[in-house]
Amino acid sequence: STLNILRAFSKGGFADLNKVHLWNLDYIKKSPQAKKFKELEDKIADALAFMEACGITSDFNNRLYTVNFWTSHEALHLPFEESMTRVDSTTGEYHDTSAHFVWIGDRTRQLDGGHVEFCKGIENPIGIKCGPTSKPDEIAKICEVLNPKNEKGKITLISRFGHQNVEKFLPKLIRGIKKEGLNVIWSCDPM
């Protein structure tokens, strides 16, 4: 239900840049950033006034009053993820509707485990957390299982080594994935 209300707000005009002054942002007004935010509001209003003078308004361009948003989370609790999985009636493909993007955690990415098995069956983009215990050949095999067609954009490797380990582990992982010719997106979790 939270996602549905966000969808309604994002498409129903709440995100309209023309209403930036009306958004309930009391927390900003009480913060040290209030002056900067007010300046930003004013710049947006000036830009919109200029665009309107040029004939570009939200009457003709929905990008001025709607936004797209994407959600993600760790696919940790499999009974929940399974209950949120639906079949696309036009393609027959399965999608986890609990989020647009789900990831497998560092402690649950066993090749023969339930989390990999679940994610193997859905069409969502999938992230794989990679920490100091990750072995490049293991991560490569998981990528191949989750993305057998090696589609671009399907797999994101989320490095989570910590500042003290990143130089030791990340280059090996990058070389291992590159050697296998796998299409992945690289992301960093600074935790």
Where are these regions (language model features)?
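Catalytic-face loop-and-helix region of soluble metabolic enzyme cores
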Residues: 143-191
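Active-site-facing alpha/beta catalytic cores
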Residues: 1-162
